[in-house]
């Protein structure tokens, strides 16, 4: 029989109330209270919920705050971790959620974050700052949009805003360190850039190189439209010049 044990149901075993900051725990195999370590362990398809945040895992461990024995200050998630918010879903192997800071650090092989616009994977951690409405992915990051365009970098920061319906949606992604964009028609590299979710364009800066079917353009600024797969070098208003190498098409033999 499925056992759903909310934290509130443990009050008979604990001197102080354990439901704090509107956090609840569900688990198929039960919830254990370890008084000495001041922690709760939920096992078997465990779920922690707080307002519009949900964390699922094989095992969840809730730690009480040293200063306030009736408040959970940190949650650890182990095994098949999934965190869901109104704007994203994240997946990994382990997560640490700081309740006070409203921050979650996810690790996986790889860690993954999905929004309606993009799917982002990272060899390193993904840190989600819910109160700041942003997610940061480090090390070997790859983003893929709905049209199959690939964006690579060592650091990506996704920012979210509320739309006219008061729903959180992706606003932009800041892309830094070893940036590369691969579309069906071109490969573009740069030091940094910013993806605008509304326009579907990525604006690239510093040491930009566009390779389109063997034709190469170089400059300090560029624009890649992920909707049309068109990339172009932009003037930076300085004295720097745009250079290009164009591949001559081979004539067909008669």
Give residue spans per PLM region.
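Mature-chain termini and adjacent capping regions
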Residues: 1-254
């Amino acid at each position: 029989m499925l056992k759903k044990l909310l934290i509130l149901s443990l009050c008979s075993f604990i001197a102080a109330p354990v439901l704090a900051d509107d956090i609840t725990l569900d688990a198929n195999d039960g919830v254990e209270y370890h008084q000495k370590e001041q922690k709760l362990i939920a096992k078997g398809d465990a779920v922690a919920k707080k307002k519009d945040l949900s964390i699922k895992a094989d095992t969840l461990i809730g730690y009480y705050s040293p200063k306030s024995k009736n408040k959970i200050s940190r949650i650890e998630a182990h095994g098949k971790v999934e965190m869901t918010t109104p704007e994203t879903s994240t997946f990994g192997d382990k997560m640490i959620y700081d309740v006070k800071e409203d921050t979650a650090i996810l690790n996986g092989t790889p860690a993954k974050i999905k929004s309606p616009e993009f799917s982002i994977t990272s060899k390193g951690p993904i840190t989600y700052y819910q109160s700041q409405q942003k997610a940061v992915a480090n090390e070997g990051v790859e983003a893929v949009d709905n049209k199959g365009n690939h964006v690579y970098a060592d650091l990506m920061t996704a920012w979210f805003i509320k739309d006219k319906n008061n729903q959180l949606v992706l606003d932009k992604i800041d892309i830094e360190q070893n940036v590369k964009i691969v579309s069906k028609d071109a490969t573009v590299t740069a030091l940094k850039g910013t993806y605008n979710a509304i326009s579907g364009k990525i604006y690239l800066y510093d040491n930009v190189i566009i390779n389109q079917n063997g034709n190469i353009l170089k400059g300090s600024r560029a624009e890649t439209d992920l909707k049309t797969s068109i990339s172009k070098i932009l003037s930076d208003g300085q004295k720097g010049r745009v250079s290009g190498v164009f591949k001559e098409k081979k004539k067909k033999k008669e």
